[in-house]
C-alpha cells in the first residue's frame, strides 16, 4: 500500500513538472508571436509613411484629397492608383506634380469601359 502511494506521488510530481514545462513553452511562444506581430506592424507603418511622403511630393493638395476620398470609398482602386503613381515617380516619368485633373484622367484610364445599354419599347 505504501509503494502505491509513493508511485502516485511520483506520477503527480511528474505531471506537475510536465504541466509547468508546457505552460512555460506556451508563454515563450506567445511572447515571440507578440514580438513578430509588433515588428510586422512597425514595418507596415514605416512603409505607409514612406508611401505618404512620396505621394506628398508628387500630388497637389487637391489630388491628394481626391485620392484619400477614393481610398475610403474604393480601397482596392485607391491602393492600385497609389502604387501606379509611386512607380511612375520612382522611374522618373513624372515631370511635375500631378494635379486633380490629371489624377481624374488617370482614374478614367484605369476604369474598364462600360457598355451602355438602352431599352426601347416598341
From Swiss-Prot:
Taken from the UniProt entry, a GO cellular component term is:
cytosol
Q: Which Gene3D superfamilies match?
A: PDCD5-like (1.10.8.140)
Q: Which GO terms describe its molecular function?
A: DNA binding
Q: Does the keyword DNA-binding apply?
A: yes
- Signal peptide positions are none
Alphabetical keyword list: DNA-binding
Supply the Pfam families for this chain: dsDNA_bind (PF01984)
What protein family does this chain belong to?
Answer: Belongs to the PDCD5 family.
Name recorded for this polypeptide: DNA-binding protein Mbar_A0455
Species for this entry: Methanosarcina barkeri (strain Fusaro / DSM 804)
Amino acid at each position: 500500500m505504501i509503494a502505491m502511494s509513493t508511485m502516485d506521488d511520483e506520477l503527480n510530481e511528474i505531471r506537475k513538472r510536465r504541466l509547468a514545462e508546457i505552460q512555460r513553452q506556451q508563454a515563450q511562444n506567445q511572447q515571440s508571436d507578440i514580438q513578430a506581430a509588433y515588428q510586422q506592424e512597425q514595418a507596415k507603418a514605416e512603409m505607409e509613411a514612406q508611401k505618404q511622403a512620396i505621394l506628398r511630393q508628387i500630388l497637389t493638395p487637391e489630388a491628394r484629397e481626391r485620392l484619400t476620398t477614393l481610398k475610403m470609398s474604393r480601397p482596392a482602386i485607391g491602393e492600385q492608383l497609389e502604387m501606379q503613381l509611386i512607380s511612375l515617380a520612382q522611374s522618373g516619368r513624372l515631370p511635375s506634380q500631378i494635379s486633380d485633373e490629371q489624377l481624374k484622367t488617370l482614374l478614367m484610364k484605369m476604369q474598364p469601359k462600360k457598355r451602355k445599354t438602352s431599352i426601347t419599347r416598341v
